[in-house]
Amino acid sequence: MTTEKPLNLLISNDDGIFALGVRTLANTLAKAGHQVTVVCPDRERSATGHGLTLHQPIRAQIVEGIFDPQVTAWSCSGTPSDCIKFALSAVLFTRPDFVLSGINHGSNLGTDILYSGTVSAAMEGLIDGITSIALSLTSFSSQDFQPAANFAVDLIAKLARHPLPQPTLLNVNVPPVKSEDMAGVKLTRQGLRRYRENFEKRLDPRGKSYYWLVGEVIEEIEQPDHLHLPGHIPTDVQAIGDNYITITPLQYNLTDVQGFSDLNQTQWFDP
C-alpha cells in the first residue's frame, strides 16, 4: 500500500507503548509510506484526561523491537498529553502533518471524551494548531484493530487531499465488526453517555479500607433542550449502535454560548 505523498505523523495513546492498538496503527501507517513517530506512555494511562506532569521529571527513551523498523518509537513516563508536548518540543525536527492518538481499546463516546487520555493527546495536537485524530475500537474484548487502522490510512489521505479550513480534532469510533459488516461512516455530534457509579469499599490484609470505582454505562441520555443541538444529526452513541464508524469534530473551546446569553440577560453584573 502506497500513498500519493508521504506524511509526517505523530502518534500517541493512553493504553501505553506496548498496546496492540498503537502498534497496529503505527505499523499500518508506516507500511502505507508515511514517516511515523510514536511517543507513548510507558504504562497504562487510561482515563487520565488532560493531566500534565509538573512536580516530577519526565523520563523518556527510544524503544526498539516493538514496532516495524521504519517506525521511530519513544516511551515516556508522563501522561498522554505530556507525550505530545514532549514530542513536539524535544523529539521532532519537522512539524507533523497530523497527530493521531490510539487506537484505544474501548470506546470514547459522549462524555467519555472528558476523561479520555486518548482524546486529550489528540486535543494537545489541536492546541498546537495541528489537525488531530483520536481513534477508538468500541470493545474491550475484540483484538482486531486492523479495520480501524485501515480507516485511519484512508482518512488522512482524504484530509491531505482536502485540508480542513481550520485545524480540528476528529474523534473517530470504530465498531468491533468485520469491515464488510460495517454500515458505513457517519458524521455525528457528541452524545451524552453517563455511568451509574459507586465506590466499592474493601479491606486490605492489614484491615485498612480502600476503594474501587465500579459502575455500568447508561448508554444514552437525552441532551438538555437548551443546548440547541441539531436533532437531525445522530449522536456518536446512536450511530455506533447501528455499526457505523463515527466521526465527531471537536474543539477545545468549552464556552456555553447559550449560558453566556442567559447570564447576559440576567443583568447581574454592571455593564
UniProtKB/Swiss-Prot annotation:
User: Looking at the record's lineage, which domain of life comes first?
Assistant: Bacteria
Broadest EC class assigned to this enzyme: hydrolase
Enumerate the GO terms in the molecular function aspect: 3'-nucleotidase activity; 5'-nucleotidase activity; exopolyphosphatase activity; metal ion binding; nucleotide binding
Name of one Pfam family that matches: SurE
Which NCBIfam families does this entry report, sorted A to Z? PRK00346.1-4, PRK00346.2-2, surE
- Briefly state the protein's biological role: Nucleotidase that shows phosphatase activity on nucleoside 5'-monophosphates.
Query: What is the designated name of this protein?
Result: 5'-nucleotidase SurE
From which organism does this entry originate? Gloeothece citriformis (strain PCC 7424)
